[in-house]
A protein has these predicted regions:
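N-terminal topogenic module of multi-pass integral membrane proteins
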Residues: 353-400
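Short amphipathic alpha-helices and their capping loops
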Residues: 1-14, 82-137
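Alpha-helical transmembrane segments in multipass membrane proteins, preferentially the mid-helix core
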Residues: 406-408, 456-478
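Acyl/amide activation-and-transfer machinery of modular secondary-metabolite enzymes
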Residues: 2-18, 33-35, 123-134, 190-226, ...
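Non-catalytic N-terminal regions of enzymes
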Residues: 1-90, 143-147, 152-174, 281-284, ...
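Membrane-helix interface and helix-disruption motif detector
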Residues: 380-399, 414-419, 435-454, 472-475, ...
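Hydrophobic alpha-helical transmembrane segments and adjacent interfacial helices
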Residues: 374-385, 405-409, 427-443, 461-464
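Helical lid/core segments from catalytic subdomains that handle acyl or acyl-like groups
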Residues: 132, 199-281
């Protein structure tokens, strides 16, 4: 009612072959599912996780343990069991809420002026499916060039990404800066062994159109930004600013539905302050005996904009672009910039099962039904006007279509929890009965006949659902009440 929460689940994870598009939804409202999934495809092991459980560091640690145990089972004769993490770590350490531990309500807050960033224009109709573009390069090559220019690899890649975006901008778009969101692992700044979310972010960017638009100019500006904003004091300020909202005594007890709407509105506004995202997962390390069986690690995230994720294993730096746009020009520009710097970039074809596509059939059925309802209302009104202009029988047709559409729409939205769906249908159909009774001249049939019969029908439906799905009293009693 007031906040989201995680609860223990008796569901057992099932490892299966990859069967849907990467980064598909794991959290489905009203449906009891695990918030992570392990699948495989050919020689690749996939670990997908919902961000509420952990961040990139926690996900990487889990994947390392998963791969280690898999390799040990396969090559038990050649491998020795090893500990990847600190043997003295406890579950309490790993479940520590480090945000709360380092939160300081008295930390001085600095007001930051909000700047609208340039937004990447869609080159046509945006894809609903996640577009993935992968490449790899030598860590030594890239690191050598970064050292020549006296910057870190993160700074070099950030500058290249900003310039790649700029090449697709018009003169009008240059009025706004290109701003990237770059997540920061706070464990490197504030000591923590937590596997829960513990990250912040910085927003390096560049204002083009001022005459100094070369790669070297951008690189110098990004280098300076990183130096100024990756300090402990600056990251603490950002962290405290965000946690203060969660800790607010009044907001804490605001209804969840109101919070969700405010969060969505805030997220929509925040989107205007960022052009794209660059996430550097840093180095993934494995014991030498195990590393010989591993080719590379890779990472990518679901996104509504363009995002670049980076991680390295041995001498291979893996780059993964994800977006829902139909253009790959930015990716092409990025690879070309790195090639011109002297880095050999190998673009790899994303390899996924052919049938691993998102399923939008239910959504399409609802869209077709919506169109049919609107068409029926329009046709009835036209017929009414032409044939019998003084009768207005089309009002009843429109009301009937609206009733059917609303009932089906709620049924579609609540389809993952049949008991909750039934409870909603009880309220909706009862309300519709009363409205129809009022609209046709109150006779009381809705209260005397309609609602009692609907209640009886819903009770029977709930009983059947509970029996078929073998639900425990804890799961269905609340709906009976």
């Amino acid at each position: 009612l007031f906040w989201h929460y995680l609860e223990k689940s008796e569901l057992r994870p099932v490892v299966r072959e990859e069967y849907k598009e990467p980064c598909s939804s794991l959290y489905v409202r009203d449906k009891k599912t695990l918030l992570f999934e392990v699948t495989y495809y050919k020689k690749r092991i996939n670990f997908e996780v919902f961000h509420a459980l952990t961040d990139g560091t926690g996900a990487t640690e889990f994947l390392r343990e998963l791969v280690k145990n898999y390799l040990y089972l396969i090559h038990e004769e050649d491998l020795e069991p090893v500990e990847l993490s600190n043997q003295y770590l406890t579950v309490k350490d790993q479940e520590d809420d480090s945000f709360s531990r380092y939160y300081d309500p008295d930390f001085p807050r600095k007001k930051k002026k909000k700047i609208r960033a340039v937004q990447i224009k869609k080159g046509g109709k945006g894809y609903e499916e996640l577009q993935i573009n992968e490449a790899s390069m030598s860590v030594k090559e890239l690191l050598g060039i970064a050292r020549e220019k006296k910057v870190s690899m993160s700074v070099l890649l950030t500058a290249a990404f900003i310039c790649a975006i700029h090449e697709e901008m018009s003169r009008m778009q240059e009025k706004k800066p290109v701003i990237l969101m770059v997540p920061v692992n706070l464990r490197k700044i504030f000591p923590s062994d937590s596997m829960l979310n513990f990250f912040g972010y910085i927003e390096p960017g560049y204002q083009f159109g001022g005459g100094k638009d070369s790669f070297e100019d951008v690189l110098e500006a990004v280098k300076l930004y990183f130096q100024e904003n990756l300090s402990k004091e600056h990251m603490a300020g950002r962290m405290n600013e965000l946690i203060a909202i969660e800790k607010h005594k009044i907001l804490k007890w605001a209804p969840l539905e109101l919070k969700n709407r405010c969060i969505r509105a805030g997220a929509k506004m925040a989107e205007q302050e960022v052009t794209a995202v660059l996430s550097n997962m840093s180095v993934v390390k494995m014991p030498e005996d195990y590393a010989q069986y591993i080719e590379k690690f890779g990472v990518y995230t679901s996104t509504n904009r363009t995002e670049l994720c980076i991680c390295s294993f041995k001498d291979t730096l893996s780059l993964s672009f994800t977006s829902r746009y139909d253009s790959t020009n930015i990716q092409r520009n990025f690879y070309r910039i790195l090639t011109e710097l002297g880095v050999q970039v190998t673009v790899t074809e994303a390899d996924f099962p052919e049938d691993a596509k998102a399923n939008y059939e239910g959504k399409k059925v609802l869209q077709i039904f919506t169109f049919c309802c609107i068409a029926a209302i329009v046709l009835s009104m036209m017929t009414d006007i032409i044939i019998s202009p003084g009768v207005h029988w089309s009002v009843y047709v429109a009301s009937g279509c609206a009733t059917m559409w609303f009932t089906m729409a709620v049924g579609y939205v609540k389809r993952f929890n049949l008991l909750k769906n039934a409870a909603w249908q009880l309220l909706i159909m009862s309300g519709i009965c009363v409205l129809w009774d009022l609209g046709t001249g109150w006779r009381g049939w809705s209260v005397n006949i309609g609602i009692p019969n609907i209640c009886l029908l819903i009770q029977i439906v709930m009983l059947i659902i509970s029996r078929i799905r073998s639900l425990s009293p804890r799961e269905y009693m609340i709906y009976y009440v």
